[in-house]
A protein has these predicted regions:
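Soluble non-cytosolic domains of exported or imported proteins
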Residues: 58, 62, 106-109, 175-178, ...
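Active-site loop architecture of trypsin-fold serine endopeptidases
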Residues: 8-10, 131-134, 166-169, 187-200, ...
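A secondary-structure boundary/capping signal
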Residues: 79, 123-124, 198, 267
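C-terminal recognition in membrane/secretory proteostasis and scaffolding
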Residues: 1-44, 66, 111, 147, ...
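Interdomain regulatory linker/hinge segments that flank or connect interaction modules
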Residues: 51-53, 183, 264-280
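Glycine-biased strand-turn-strand hairpin within the trypsin-fold
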Residues: 32-121, 129-132, 142-143, 164-167, ...
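Conserved active-site neighborhood of the chymotrypsin/trypsin-like protease fold
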Residues: 109-111, 116-195
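Residue-level recognition of beta-strand microenvironments
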Residues: 78-81, 115-117, 125, 149-151, ...
């Protein structure tokens, strides 16, 4: 019996990965003493553990899926009508040297995110500046007009108050700071393709960008998750689905205004301050 136990101990040392399972077998043996394990027993137990781990991983959602599911109920489509010439030129799409003047544009599309239990919406100021009519559509499909609650042109941040809140309000979860190399996700309505998700990384911090109206936006987050016109005002998210920034524009060497790998967002700490306090 002593040799049997020594052999058992030796096998257990080799298969430490399944020690917990093997230990369970030992505790359930009767008074006749422990049964010696064979190589077949160990191999079968190890395979069972591996199979269960694979099954668990397969059933778990991909991180991008979890990120989207976390933000989707808080996402808002913002439509502006009768935009003025000022609204067109204020959009900081960060082209080089300037973006084309879109004074003739009558309808605009942007993104916003619910930030509190009242249904207030955080977005980019250039999305709504100069608009005569603002309509917001919530995740449940309900739509209502909205009024501007606050604006901060220096940071390109605005807060909208919906005239009628949805029946179920799900405020976004607010995150903290980021560092270069962190995963980054952008969700919005690029080119009218509503509720689109793109993924990338944080590429740089504390960027300063001069926009078309001559002002400078400072302290921006640079990221490479794809964004295009329509993403403005939407959330930049971390790997946990928490809002870490508000998308404000993209850099482009051409006049087309489409994404080439450099996007910018206002940090949520700045956006919260511009909105009158840290979003809850």
């Amino acid at each position: 019996m002593k040799r049997s136990r020594l052999r058992t101990s030796g096998i257990l040392a080799v298969v430490a990965l399944v020690a917990a399972v093997v230990g369970f077998v030992f505790t359930r043996t009767g008074s006749s003493g422990p049964k010696a394990l064979t190589k077949a027993d160990v191999a079968k137990t190890a395979q069972t553990v591996v199979d269960k781990a694979i099954e668990k991983a397969a059933n778990a959602p991909a991180r991008s899926v979890a990120v989207y599911q976390a933000i989707a109920p808080s996402l808002v489509v913002i439509r502006t009508d009768e935009a003025t010439a000022d609204a067109a030129t204020a959009a900081p799409s960060f082209a080089t040297p300037t973006v084309p003047n879109r004074a003739e544009q009558k309808v605009g599309l942007g993104t916003g995110v619910i930030i509190n239990a009242d249904g207030d919406i955080l977005t980019a100021n250039h999305v709504i500046v100069g608009a005569k009519l603002i309509t917001v559509t919530f995740a449940d499909g309900s739509a209502t007009t909205a009024t501007i609650k606050s604006q901060e042109p220096k940071t390109d941040i605005a807060v909208l108050a919906p005239d009628q809140a949805p029946s179920v309000i799900v405020p976004a979860v607010i995150g903290g700071g980021v560092q270069i190399g962190d995963e980054a996700y952008a969700v919005g309505h690029p080119l009218g393709l509503t509720r689109s998700l793109s993924a990338g990384v944080i590429s740089g911090l504390d960027r300063s960008i001069k926009v078309e109206n001559g002002s400078t936006l400072e302290g921006l987050i640079q990221f490479d998750a794809a964004v295009n016109p329509g993403n403005s005002g939407g959330p930049l998210l971390n790997r946990n689905g928490q809002v870490v920034g508000i998308v404000t524009g993209l850099a482009n060497p051409s006049e087309q205004g489409f994404f080439v790998g450099i996007g910018f967002a206002v940090p949520i700490s700045t956006a919260g301050g511009a909105a009158g306090g840290p979003p809850q």
